[in-house]
From Swiss-Prot:
NCBIfam families: F420_cofC (TIGR03552). The gene is cofC. The keyword Nucleotide-binding applies. This is 2-phospho-L-lactate guanylyltransferase. The lineage of its organism: Archaea, Methanobacteriati, Methanobacteriota, Stenosarchaea group, Halobacteria. Guanylyltransferase that catalyzes the activation of (2S)-2-phospholactate (2-PL) as (2S)-lactyl-2-diphospho-5'-guanosine, via the condensation of 2-PL with GTP. It is involved in the biosynthesis of coenzyme F420, a hydride carrier cofactor.
Length: 201
């Protein structure tokens, strides 16, 4: 299956600015992107990175500077999938399950109401990645008379946006993203019963 992996190459992951500087955020975002591409390939998909700037990586890259929604709509040709570049916990097994789920549209909701992955098999479906996109995608499918289904997956639900999300990468990740955090000095810590991260060195 063809898989678009959108990637904000310029100033990525700004919500991590209090934890990582600009160069570190760029390096960490790239590690997550490559983890996602590795998982897509291992699941039998063919990733194309939809980037806002040119990238020097092994996978095909299409540059589109437009906002996320029009950029994806312009390049999504069903049957195809969209997988966000910051679902650093994703595994080939989670993606194989997503790809195998029947339905004209298959949605993998993210925590907080986003859409972290999407399979589109029907022509005439347009994406909407603003606001509570999982709700908007369900409504769009219903309005178009398109069969939409959801996949409940922890590995696809967690996207890495906030400093507190970094703990999930160290707890559950085993790819480039987890290695990058460890090499940068991040370790798990407990604060008031909640697992967080701290940086040493």
């Amino acid at each position: 299956m063809d898989v678009l992996v959108p990637f904000a190459a310029r100033e990525p992951k700004t919500r991590l600015a209090g934890t990582l500087d600009a160069d570190e955020r760029a390096a960490f975002a790239r590690a997550m992107l490559l983890d996602v591409c590795d998982a897509v390939e291992a699941a039998g998909g063919e990733p194309t990175v939809l980037a806002t700037e040119p990238l020097a990586i092994e996978q095909p890259v299409v540059v589109d500077k437009r906002p996320l929604t029009p950029a994806i709509d312009a390049h999504l040709s069903p049957p195809a999938a969209v997988v966000m570049a910051d679902v650093a916990l994703v595994t080939p097994a989670a993606l194989r399950r997503l790809f195998a789920t029947t339905g004209d549209v298959v949605i993998a909701p993210g925590l907080g109401g986003g859409t972290n992955a999407l399979v589109v098999r029907a022509d005439g479906f347009t994406v909407d990645y603003h606001g509570t996109s999982v709700r908007d995608h369900r409504r769009a499918a219903e309005g178009a008379g398109i069969d939409a289904r959801s996949v409940d997956s922890f590995r696809l639900a967690v996207d890495i946006d906030e400093p507190t999300d970094l703990a999930e990468v160290l707890l559950h990740g085993d790819g480039r993203s987890a290695d990058w955090l460890k090499n940068a000095g991040f370790r798990l810590a407990e604060t008031d019963g909640r697992t967080t991260v701290e940086r040493r060195g």
